[in-house]
Amino acid sequence: MKKTYRVKREKDFQAIFKDGKSTANRKFVIYHLNRGQDHFRVGISVGKKIGNAVTRNAVKRKIRHVIMALGHQLKSEDFVVIARKGVESLEYQELQQNLHHVLKLAQLLEKGFESEEKH
């Protein structure tokens, strides 16, 4: 994922948490904030309660892969994806479905893409 598509600075994370809206399902929480940019930016957070470092990094890679696959469908907003406990045991397909579901709930998918079948 290119650096321009990442939320990296603590200040940006805090602004999204403070001023953004949140949406959740059983496996993910998403905070999002529209800042008027021309593309989306994403930050991924996987807490220490979820496995060891290897497991957390694997979860982050899977989330990043799903986000990039959905990239053309995402609205131009900043958002932070927080993984909840239990996400580490999901297969890729289940993780993709859960993430797609919470993005749809947060209305972060462009019109016309929400009704598309999941891969």
From Swiss-Prot:
Family statement drawn from the similarity comment of this UniProt entry: Belongs to the RnpA family.
InterPro entries from the UniProt entry: Ribosomal_Su5_D2-typ_SF, Ribsml_uS5_D2-typ_fold_subgr, RNase_P, RNase_P_CS
Catalyzed reactions per annotation: Endonucleolytic cleavage of RNA, removing 5'-extranucleotides from tRNA precursor
Function: RNaseP catalyzes the removal of the 5'-leader sequence from pre-tRNA to produce the mature 5'-terminus. It can also cleave other RNA substrates such as 4.5S RNA. The protein component plays an auxiliary but essential role in vivo by binding to the 5'-leader sequence and broadening the substrate specificity of the ribozyme.
Enzyme class: hydrolase
Any one Gene Ontology cellular component term annotated for this protein: ribonuclease P complex
Record note on quaternary structure: Consists of a catalytic RNA component (M1 or rnpB) and a protein subunit.
Keywords, alphabetical: Endonuclease, Hydrolase, Nuclease, RNA-binding, tRNA processing
Name of the protein: Ribonuclease P protein component
GO biological process: tRNA 5'-leader removal
GO MF annotation: an example: tRNA binding
The enzyme's E.C. designation: 3.1.26.5
The organism of origin for this protein: Streptococcus pyogenes serotype M1
KW Nucleotide-binding (keyword) present: no
Gene: rnpA
